[in-house]
Design a protein with these regions (language model features):
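Expand to "…catalyze enediolate/carbanion chemistry for C-C bond making/breaking, isomerization
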Residues: 1-294
Length: 294
């Protein structure tokens, strides 16, 4: 999956928003054909994807298609598979391994018809129901083109409603589902598990607090619904200078200890062994990749 932290939803039927997206600093964009597009506008949204995806630089465009049960999925796939600039698809409300296999078969057939490399179109599975949470790992490993999970825990969203819980800003009622989705993604060896949207675009402080928690849990990016969320999202999913300094000192101290015949040492009073050194290396490697990506 291409390196990304911020995934901004853009209704694909709104040329004004698509034009604006061309100049925004989000790492990736989700051109939406689903919930943000009214039924009468679905055809216009597909046309918007075809017109604007090729204009985006880099591997930045994903498309959220309509579900298999809507009668719209086939037309969505026919419209977008093979369009230049599209990395892959966000699949909404998936609940079972069989659904993933159906999507995989439909996409694979279109790839063959259109001369694409098998598996070229990647998939992110949106976890938006209790059943989806429980089946998250099995769905993750159902097809090689699945590259990440996306948690759908927005206030009054599908998962919130399915669980029957009362959403709060601190989020304890959603924490189990949020953590289970993260666990399934990591067990499937996905590098970039994605957290859900924060729906109150007026609450900048709440967004930052929730995104900081998201990163502590292990998520590496999230879906966004407003351009104002891009900068704090990119900043908060990036290691801080203090973290980078600490992990650089960890590696330096550990390498020095190994050279002296020891497999452990201490930094700032904390014991450091090979596991901690490997963790430090992962953080520093990720930071270097972000710096290279700009």
């Amino acid at each position: 999956m291409p390196l990304a932290r911020s995934f901004l939803y853009v209704p694909a039927n709104r040329d004004k928003f698509l034009d604006k997206a061309l100049g925004l600093p989000a790492d990736a964009f989700i051109f939406d054909l689903e919930d943000s597009v009214p039924p009468a506008e679905k055809a216009n949204a597909r046309a918007g994807v075809r017109a604007y995806a090729p204009k985006m630089s880099g591997e930045r465009v994903w498309v959220r298609v309509n579900g298999l049960d809507t009668g719209l999925a086939e037309a969505d796939l026919d419209a977008v598979i093979g369009v230049a600039g599209i990395v892959g698809l966000f699949l909404p409300k998936v609940e079972t391994r069989d659904e993933v296999l159906r999507w995989d078969g439909m996409i694979g057939a279109l790839e063959r018809q259109r001369g694409l490399t098998p598996g070229a179109i990647k998939l992110v599975l949106s976890i938006e129901s209790a059943r989806g949470v429980l089946n998250a790992y099995d769905m993750s490993v159902a097809a090689a083109r699945v590259v990440s999970l996306s948690f759908g825990g927005a206030q009054d969203g599908d998962l919130n409603t399915d669980l029957g819980c009362v959403w709060s800003i601190d989020g304890p009622e959603m924490l189990h589902a949020r953590s289970h989705t993260l666990l399934a993604a990591r067990a499937a060896r996905f590098d970039t598990p994605l957290d859900g949207v924060f729906a109150d675009v007026r609450d900048a402080e709440g967004f930052e607090r929730d995104t900081a928690l998201s990163r502590r849990l292990g998520y590496r990016g999230r879906k966004l619904i407003h351009p104002s969320q891009i900068e704090p999202c990119n900043r908060l999913y990036r290691p801080s200078e203090a973290e980078l300094d600490y992990y650089a000192r960890v590696l330096e101290a550990f390498d020095r200890a190994v050279a002296q015949g020891s497999a452990s040492t201490t930094v700032d009073g904390r014991m450091i062994d090979v596991a901690m050194a490997n963790a430090a290396r992962r953080v520093l490697d990720a930071a270097a990749a972000w710096k290279k990506a700009g």
